[in-house]
Amino acid sequence: MLSKVDIRQVIKQRNKCLSKAEREAQSAAILAHLANHPRFKAAQTVMLFSSLPDEVNTHAFIRQWTQTKRIVLPVVKGDDMELRLFTTEEDMHIGAFGISEPIGLAFDKLDEIDLIIVPGMAFDKEGHRLGRGKGYYDRFLSQPNIMSTYKIGICLPHQLVESIPTEAHDIMMNEVIG
């Protein structure tokens, strides 16, 4: 089994081989699958993420669904994440790590979140996730009032791997779309 460091290196190399057009086509297919997922259809409040260039491109998807669903996005605050309600592109700024973040008030009604969509460097078929190594999502998702919320990891097909080494603090996904 490859180490977490080795898997990250492999994924970074695979990312370099993917054209922008391929990434956009794959993103569209993954997000179409998500949009038709029964859990997404039923959800009123969805935690999504503002994508980085090497992730499933979520920007248009967020704008598309903000009219019919309450969309909340993570914002990095020191060593932790908090959520903010997405309203419009105009109410976004570039935050930590170059991530586009909402500038509005914090959303603290975590028990109202119906579905959590999670990015990752890699996922395996069992639902194990490999992040970027800072632990933001693992810390956030370990909060008691969202531990049982359904979590779907989304990634590009080349980010699906056979197996990811896990540690006790790693939070599993209920499902992975990639």
Positions of predicted regions on the chain:
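N-terminal active-site beta-alpha-beta segment that forms phosphate/nucleotide-binding
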Residues: 1-111
